[in-house]
Structure formats: structure tokens, C-alpha cells
């Protein structure tokens, strides 16, 4: 819009602007006591003897840092709740809206659910940026939600120093078929459904304004089809790869499941332009923080720094990392019994 560059109005960009994972875990430490006394997550609720509705039961809370919270509201129905928002990741307002909404919807797909309703979350510097630009952002979010068959039912807005946009999304799922981070079992292959590298390219875009259509294609592609295929394949362990990078999300899944995740670095798909950008040094601070967080728990073998930084690249609206094989998507490693490190690079 008239040469306006949205990325210049925020210090971070996309999921790279998340609070660093180590700091986030310290922040949340001790705030999960309520979940500690909850019944076994995958046990069925006690039957009602009075005919009254069954009381909701928390199935997935904050204990493992899963993609969304899940509560059982009936014998065969669970409700998924998530929220996600961030600063501009691209300069075009409409495209930013599409990416932010696609990213928010992904948390429901990552749990094996179906989005049923979304509400907008908007922070806007109205004295700096015209509201007509905010309208374009919201229109982009609406277009992404429509593509997902998910109505946008309102939202909340505040004035702020930097623009922020995203969505709170509600979804539904079969409680017996949830996909969670703590169910990876040794002997299963590891699948990744989107290539890495959008964080590197977003960093370069913010610096130069150069547009990378391949990165936009990745970030605006819904994880719906991959989620549906994962459920059909009986997969029960997985997560989406976003701000903590492939290494960070693999570490969290391995830690929650008590296993080692082995990644064959040569088999990990990476956008070719991102390889060139990484070699030129266009790595975000968020990606470096991701690597520093995972490094004490990982065996990187002979992998060089450029490779490990790409694997730690902070993704925005990335693909699904699944413990299981999904036709049409690359197998990038396997789940092993715990071998002293949560992540093993080969």
C-alpha cells in the first residue's frame, strides 16, 4: 500500500518475536499446579447417573507446552482452545493477516481437531498507521478463516505502540484421537509436512523488502489436509513447528514423551533460497536463542553451525512434526528409546 512496509513497525517478526523458550518456561514455572491434580488425560469421564450433563474435564493443560488446551465436554467430544498473535512478518497487510490467521488455526489442526470459531485479536498504533490498513489485515485473516471453513465471530482490539494481529480459535475433536506432544513411541518414523526456512527469509525480507513467494506459500498453506491424513493414519503424537524451530519443538516432544528424537539432517526439507540466505548470515536472534536453549539437551554430532541454525530457525505457520509416516511427506528421522539426549542429529 503506497510503499508502506509493515515489518518496520515491529521489533520482531512473526513467531520469531516469541518470548525465548527458556525464559518462558521460567516464567510459567509453578503456575501449573491445577493441572497436576487432574485425572489421567485420556481416561473416560465417569458416567452420569442423574442424566445431568457431564462436567468438563481438562485433558491437555500447560504441563507439556502443547499446541492448545483441550477439555472434554462429553464422552466423544472435546473442545480445543488456543490463541496466537504476532507482529508483522511481511510488509503487505493482507498477506500478514492471512499468515497470522493460518498460524493460529494450525494449533487446532496440530491437536487433530477441526476449527469451529475464531475471534480476532488486534493491537494497533492508530496515530501512526491508518485504520484502513488494519482493515486489510483483518480482511486477510477473514480470507484464511473462510478457506478453513471457520467463521470469525468478532474479536477484541486495543491501541498499542506496535501492530499485533492474530486469533483466538476454538475447535472440536474426538478425545480418543487427539494428537499430543507426549505420546511419541520408539520405533516410529518422524515426518515433517512443510519445508524449513521461512524464518531466515522473513529476516531477509525485513532487512531488504525482497519478497519470497515460496515462503509466503508455506506460511499461508493450512495444515488441515496434513492433520486429516495424520488422523486417518492413526498418528497420536505430533506438534506444529513454529517459533521454537524444528529443534525446539522436537525437544519438547521428546522430553514430554521420554524418548530421543533422531533427525537425519540431509532429509530435512529446506527452501533453497533460505539455504543461501542462511549462508549469507541472515539468521534471526530468535533462532539463535532457540539453538542455545536446545543445545544442552541435544547431540548434534557432526552437524555444522549453519545446519543447526536452520534446524533451529524460528518458523511462522510451519508444518506438522509427526511421530508416524504420512504419504506424500518426507520422513526426516525416527523416534528412539531415550539415549541421554532428547534430540540426536545424524
Model-inferred region functions:
Residues 69-80, 220-226, 291-301:
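Acidic-glycine-rich active-site phosphate/pyrophosphate-binding loop
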Residues 58-60, 68-71, 107-109, 142, ...:
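A generic local secondary-structure boundary/capping motif
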Residues 2-12, 18, 23-27, 36-56, ...:
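Glycine-/charge-enriched secondary-structure boundary and capping motifs
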Residues 94, 211-220, 236-237, 307-311:
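Short pre-catalytic strand/loop immediately N-terminal to key active-site residues, enriched for Gly-Thr
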Amino acid at each position: 500500500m503506497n510503499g508502506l512496509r509493515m515489518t518496520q513497525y515491529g521489533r520482531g517478526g512473526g513467531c520469531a518475536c516469541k518470548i525465548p523458550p527458556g525464559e518462558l518456561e521460567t516464567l510459567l514455572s509453578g503456575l501449573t499446579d491445577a493441572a497436576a491434580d487432574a485425572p489421567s488425560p485420556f481416561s473416560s469421564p465417569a458416567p452420569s447417573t442423574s442424566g445431568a450433563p457431564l462436567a468438563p474435564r481438562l485433558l491437555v493443560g500447560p504441563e507439556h507446552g502443547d499446541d492448545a488446551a483441550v477439555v472434554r465436554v462429553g464422552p466423544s467430544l472435546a473442545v480445543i482452545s488456543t490463541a496466537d498473535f504476532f507482529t508483522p512478518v511481511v510488509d503487505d497487510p493482507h498477506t500478514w493477516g492471512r499468515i497470522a490467521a493460518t498460524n493460529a488455526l494450525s494449533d487446532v489442526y496440530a491437536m487433530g481437531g477441526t476449527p469451529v470459531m475464531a475471534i480476532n485479536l488486534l493491537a494497533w498504533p492508530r496515530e501512526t498507521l491508518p485504520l484502513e490498513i488494519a482493515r486489510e489485515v483483518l480482511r486477510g485473516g477473514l480470507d484464511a478463516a473462510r478457506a478453513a471453513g471457520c467463521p470469525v465471530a468478532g474479536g477484541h482490539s486495543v491501541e498499542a505502540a506496535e501492530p499485533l494481529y492474530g486469533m483466538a480459535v476454538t475447535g472440536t475433536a474426538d478425545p480418543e484421537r487427539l494428537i499430543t506432544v507426549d505420546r511419541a513411541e520408539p520405533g516410529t518414523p518422524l515426518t515433517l509436512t512443510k519445508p524449513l526456512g521461512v524464518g531466515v527469509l522473513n529476516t531477509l525480507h525485513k532487512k531488504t523488502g525482497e519478497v519470497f513467494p515460496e515462503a509466503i506459500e508455506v506460511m499461508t498453506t493450512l495444515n488441515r489436509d496434513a492433520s486429516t491424513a495424520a488422523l486417518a493414519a492413526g498418528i497420536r503424537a505430533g506438534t506444529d513447528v513454529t517459533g521454537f524451530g524444528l529443534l525446539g519443538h522436537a525437544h519438547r516432544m521428546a522430553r514430554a514423551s521420554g524418548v530421543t528424537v533422531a533427525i537425519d539432517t540431509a532429509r530435512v526439507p529446506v527452501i533453497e533460497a533460505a539455504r543461501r540466505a542462511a549462508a549469507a548470515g541472515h539468521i534471526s536472534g530468535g533462532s539463535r536463542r532457540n539453538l542455545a536453549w536446545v543445545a544442552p539437551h541435544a547431540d548434534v554430532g557432526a552437524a555444522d553451525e549453519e545446519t543447526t541454525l536452520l534446524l533451529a530457525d524460528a518458523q511462522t505457520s510451519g508444518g506438522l512434526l509427526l511421530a508416524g509416516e504420512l504419504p506424500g511427506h518426507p520422513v526426516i528421522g525416527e523416534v528412539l528409546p531415550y539415549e541421554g539426549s532428547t534430540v540426536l542429529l545424524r
